[in-house]
């Protein structure tokens, strides 16, 4: 096929217009998300830490804890490896700062002793100067461990939103009527898209958190922008090659992402078939094969680095989450969960705009292709929602990779609606109220709601001379070494919740799964019985050392720790009475949440202390 020169020129005009209108947006996005990330100091779900920061910390610093997924090779290491790199850079910075300060402080101490050789004060000052490098280096390393991943995620988040806005511009320019005055409306839709993405409640709450779903959304937004929306004209371009790479990389990390690209690939193939361009179809699938091979090899190398063997976590992920019933171990939601809960929460105040954009007639399609960009996007969204609704285990974040397309239809809906609403200038004076309220709510939740489980790990890091710490609460209720960052604690443990992996492949797995209980289940089914069975009994004559270290006593799964950390719900229900005369005292109480969907996590965090 000979590419139409007019079509090619139009594509170049589209790219030029997009560059012009987005040149100043990226710094705004970065600045906004940096503030967003630094304000985020609350807990949402365990995967934010245990599937990204914890394996990275384990690899970079040589200590920590890995969940069962990493022990059986269910997860790809590609996303955590980014944070390992960040951690290693932090280590280098800490070492460099220590060396630089050591030289400076040594010179200062030497001069002090040289000038005042008989002074006790000078000797003490010189001694104190020599301790500064170690203390400063440890401080630099700890703050780097906490905040460097946040800043990195802010940069990634801004990148994802930047390409989302460019995608919206690109699709808009490819679908508007040729008779429209494009540039004024392009400016308007750019402003609308920027407003929608920055003030979206779920974006502010979620996008800078270290979830694989955030990374998946960012990869998806880059791939969608570089996708061939022209019906085949751009297949031979570098841009389309980039799209394939980022799309396939996203699919390897999260196989469910493939639904997006199967639909788009189907429409691209159909458009080429309708034009009878069989040569280009051959080139398309040849390029797909080559890019897939390269992408898979890159990921295999990354996973080999972590697992020390050639492994394909993507297949184990599919087996556990899609072809077995074990994913239901983590909860089952009704079929309408995403329709009635995920979409309203993810879209927020832009939900009416999205619905309007979804059901609006498609604009005139350029390049005379049968299935235009908007029609394809609507199919992608509908089929993905159907697919995710079919899965029994559902979470809001599973559909987060669709956020660029949600934003696209919302922005187009807002642009169309703005032209039809009367007294628009009057409404314009008040339209900022709803986005502002959305941001206020998100700031409150990211700053306060469930902040205690993060703060307690920071407090433990700063505590001196810790012998042992135990968390008696639902499993993975806190981060681990990614916030504690200490390798000098003799015993550090928490209640576990291992899934029944022995049921994989069993015919009666669905029946046995219903009766399976993990350690957390046993704890809350019978708190008194669990404590008495798994911990040594207190007696008035015993101190902590006798209870935990007497070899003649029967051994228990858990020992009573120096620091015992529980939720207020457990304290009120059992622990406050049981620990009377045990030697434990309430050491601290940290605010965690005003209310919680999980009653086991209600209230503040209670820290008990007993000196060994």
Swiss-Prot record:
<dbReference type="InterPro" id="IPR005599">
    <property type="entry name" value="GPI_mannosylTrfase"/>
</dbReference>
<keyword id="KW-0812">Transmembrane</keyword>
<feature type="transmembrane region" description="Helical">
    <location>
        <begin position="339"/>
        <end position="359"/>
    </location>
</feature>
<feature type="transmembrane region" description="Helical">
    <location>
        <begin position="145"/>
        <end position="165"/>
    </location>
</feature>
<protein>
    <recommendedName>
        <fullName>GPI mannosyltransferase 3</fullName>
        <ecNumber>2.4.1.-</ecNumber>
    </recommendedName>
</protein>
<feature type="glycosylation site" description="N-linked (GlcNAc...) asparagine">
    <location>
        <position position="526"/>
    </location>
</feature>
<keyword id="KW-1133">Transmembrane helix</keyword>
<feature type="glycosylation site" description="N-linked (GlcNAc...) asparagine">
    <location>
        <position position="321"/>
    </location>
</feature>
<feature type="glycosylation site" description="N-linked (GlcNAc...) asparagine">
    <location>
        <position position="550"/>
    </location>
</feature>
<feature type="transmembrane region" description="Helical">
    <location>
        <begin position="288"/>
        <end position="308"/>
    </location>
</feature>
<keyword id="KW-0328">Glycosyltransferase</keyword>
<feature type="glycosylation site" description="N-linked (GlcNAc...) asparagine">
    <location>
        <position position="188"/>
    </location>
</feature>
<keyword id="KW-0337">GPI-anchor biosynthesis</keyword>
<feature type="transmembrane region" description="Helical">
    <location>
        <begin position="398"/>
        <end position="418"/>
    </location>
</feature>
<keyword id="KW-0808">Transferase</keyword>
<dbReference type="Pfam" id="PF03901">
    <property type="entry name" value="Glyco_transf_22"/>
</dbReference>
<keyword id="KW-0472">Membrane</keyword>
<dbReference type="GO" id="GO:0006506">
    <property type="term" value="P:GPI anchor biosynthetic process"/>
</dbReference>
<dbReference type="GO" id="GO:0000026">
    <property type="term" value="F:alpha-1,2-mannosyltransferase activity"/>
</dbReference>
<comment type="function">
    <text>Mannosyltransferase involved in glycosylphosphatidylinositol-anchor biosynthesis. Transfers the third mannose to Man2-GlcN-acyl-PI during GPI precursor assembly.</text>
</comment>
<feature type="glycosylation site" description="N-linked (GlcNAc...) asparagine">
    <location>
        <position position="508"/>
    </location>
</feature>
<feature type="transmembrane region" description="Helical">
    <location>
        <begin position="254"/>
        <end position="274"/>
    </location>
</feature>
<keyword id="KW-0256">Endoplasmic reticulum</keyword>
<comment type="similarity">
    <text>Belongs to the glycosyltransferase 22 family. PIGB subfamily.</text>
</comment>
<dbReference type="GO" id="GO:0005789">
    <property type="term" value="C:endoplasmic reticulum membrane"/>
</dbReference>
<feature type="transmembrane region" description="Helical">
    <location>
        <begin position="371"/>
        <end position="391"/>
    </location>
</feature>
<comment type="pathway">
    <text>Glycolipid biosynthesis; glycosylphosphatidylinositol-anchor biosynthesis.</text>
</comment>
<feature type="transmembrane region" description="Helical">
    <location>
        <begin position="92"/>
        <end position="112"/>
    </location>
</feature>
<keyword id="KW-0325">Glycoprotein</keyword>
<feature type="transmembrane region" description="Helical">
    <location>
        <begin position="192"/>
        <end position="212"/>
    </location>
</feature>
<feature type="glycosylation site" description="N-linked (GlcNAc...) asparagine">
    <location>
        <position position="361"/>
    </location>
</feature>
<feature type="transmembrane region" description="Helical">
    <location>
        <begin position="429"/>
        <end position="449"/>
    </location>
</feature>
């Amino acid at each position: 096929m000979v590419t139409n020169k007019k079509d090619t020129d139009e594509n170049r005009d589209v790219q030029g217009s997009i560059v012009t209108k987005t040149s100043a947006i990226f710094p705004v996005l970065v600045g906004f998300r940096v503030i967003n990330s630094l304000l985020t100091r609350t807990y949402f779900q365990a995967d934010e830490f245990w599937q990204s920061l914890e394996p990275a910390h384990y690899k970079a610093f040589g200590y920590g804890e890995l969940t069962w997924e990493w022990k059986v090779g269910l997860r790809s290491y590609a996303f955590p490896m980014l944070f390992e790199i960040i951690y290693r850079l932090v280590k280098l910075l800490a070492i460099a700062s220590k060396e630089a300060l050591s030289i400076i402080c040594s010179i200062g101490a030497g001069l002090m002793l040289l000038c005042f050789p008989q002074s006790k004060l000078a000797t003490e000052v010189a001694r104190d100067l020599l301790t500064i490098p170690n203390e400063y280096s440890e401080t630099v390393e700890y703050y780097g461990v906490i905040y460097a991943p946040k800043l990195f995620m802010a940069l990634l988040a801004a990148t994802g939103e930047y390409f989302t806005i460019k995608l919206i511009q690109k699709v808009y320019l490819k679908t508007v009527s040729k008779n429209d005055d494009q540039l004024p409306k392009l400016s308007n839709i750019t402003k609308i898209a920027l407003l929608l993405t920055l003030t979206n409640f779920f974006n502010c709450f979620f996008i800078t958190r270290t979830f694989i779903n955030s990374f998946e959304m960012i990869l998806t937004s880059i791939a969608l922008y570089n996708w061939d929306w022209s019906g085949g004209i751009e297949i031979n371009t570098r841009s389309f090659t980039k799209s394939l790479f980022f799309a396939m990389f996203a699919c390897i990390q999260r196989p469910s992402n493939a639904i997006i690209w199967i639909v788009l690939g189907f429409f691209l193939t159909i458009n080429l078939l309708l034009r009878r361009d069989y040569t280009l179809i051959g080139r398309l699938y040849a390029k797909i094969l080559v890019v897939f091979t390269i992408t898979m090899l890159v990921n295999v190398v990354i996973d080999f680095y972590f697992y020390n063997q050639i492994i394909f976590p993507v297949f184990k992920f599919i087996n556990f989450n899609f072809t077995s019933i074990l994913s239901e171990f983590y909860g089952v939601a009704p079929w309408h969960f995403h329709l009635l809960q995920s979409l309203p929460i993810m879209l927020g105040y832009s939900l009416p705009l999205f619905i309007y954009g979804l059901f609006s007639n498609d604009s005139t399609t350029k390049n005379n292709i049968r299935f235009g960009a908007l029609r394809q996007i609507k199919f992608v969204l509908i089929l993905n929602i159907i697919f995710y609704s079919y899965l029994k285990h559902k979470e809001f974040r599973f559909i987060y990779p669709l956020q660029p397309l949600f934003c696209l239809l919302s922005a187009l809906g807002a642009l169309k609606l703005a032209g039809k609403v009367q007294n628009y200038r009057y409404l314009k004076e008040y339209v900022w109220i709803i986005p502002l309220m959305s941001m206020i709510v998100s700031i409150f939740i990211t700053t306060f709601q469930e902040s205690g489980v993060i703060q307690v790990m920071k407090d433990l890091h700063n505590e001196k001379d810790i012998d042992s710490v135990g968390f008696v609460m639902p499993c993975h209720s806190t981060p681990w070494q990614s916030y504690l960052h200490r390798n000098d604690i003799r015993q550090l443990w928490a209640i576990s919740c291992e899934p029944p992996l022995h049921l994989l492949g069993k015919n009666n797995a669905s029946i046995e799964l219903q009766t399976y209980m993990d350690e957390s289940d046993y704890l809350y089914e019978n708190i008194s019985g669990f404590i008495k069975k798994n911990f040594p009994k207190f007696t008035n004559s015993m101190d902590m050392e006798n209870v935990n270290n007497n070899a003649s006593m029967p051994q228990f799964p858990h020992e009573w720790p120096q620091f015992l950390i529980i939720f207020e719900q457990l304290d009120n229900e059992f622990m406050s009475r049981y620990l009377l005369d045990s030697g434990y005292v309430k050491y601290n109480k940290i605010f965690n949440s005003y209310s919680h969907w999980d009653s086991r996590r209600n209230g503040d965090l209670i820290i008990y202390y007993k000196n060994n």
